[in-house]
A protein has these predicted regions:
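Catalytic cores of glycan-processing enzymes that make or break glycosidic bonds
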Residues: 1-165
Length: 165
């Protein structure tokens, strides 16, 4: 199937959701077709990765927000995370994590809006296994709410060499 797909659309880019415990055949298939995998900071911050093979995420739609996640960390885990972001000057740890992710060598970095705005757990988009409200209902009340954060991220993008990407 992938052979046919890539023969018909050679420039096609596919992202493989390669999270969790997977059989080696999944990784073999991903690598054979040069599919991008996923690096999610909340899961992988203490693991080595080939960042050219992944799309970097601060978190996904199934994770807590960065602020909520940081608040829930055990002391030892928080110390580990702190070692990765110690050299960043941003005021808040969630911003330091975003900057760290932008500095990684991955071509693409995805940062959910609730992470960019430093939202707490109350803004969590989805809790797997939970049905109904408030899952899948996150909304900005206005873009003005988001505008105040743009200058900080513009600077991070510049410093990380991602401006215009």
């Amino acid at each position: 199937m992938f052979d046919t797909l890539f023969n018909k659309v050679p420039e096609l880019s596919i992202l493989a959701e390669d999270l969790g415990e997977l059989r080696h055949q999944v990784y073999d298939l991903r690598d054979h077709y040069h599919l991008k995998g996923m690096y999610v900071f909340q899961f992988h911050y203490c693991y080595d990765f080939d960042f050219h093979k992944v799309v970097v995420y601060t978190g996904t739609h199934d994770n807590d927000t960065l602020v909520g996640w940081l608040d829930s960390l055990e002391k030892e885990d928080y110390k580990k995370v702190s070692t990765y972001i110690a050299n960043y000057d941003e005021v808040h740890d969630y911003q330091k994590i975003i900057h760290y992710c932008l500095d990684l060598e991955a071509m693409h970095v995805i940062v959910p809006v609730w992470d960019m705005m430093g939202c707490d757990t109350s803004a969590r988009f989805n809790v797997p296994g939970k049905i109904g409200s408030p899952n899948w209902e996150y909304r900005l009340s206005s873009f003005e709410q988001f505008d105040s954060y743009l200058e900080d991220y513009k600077n991070m993008l510049e410093v990380s060499g991602r401006k215009g990407v």
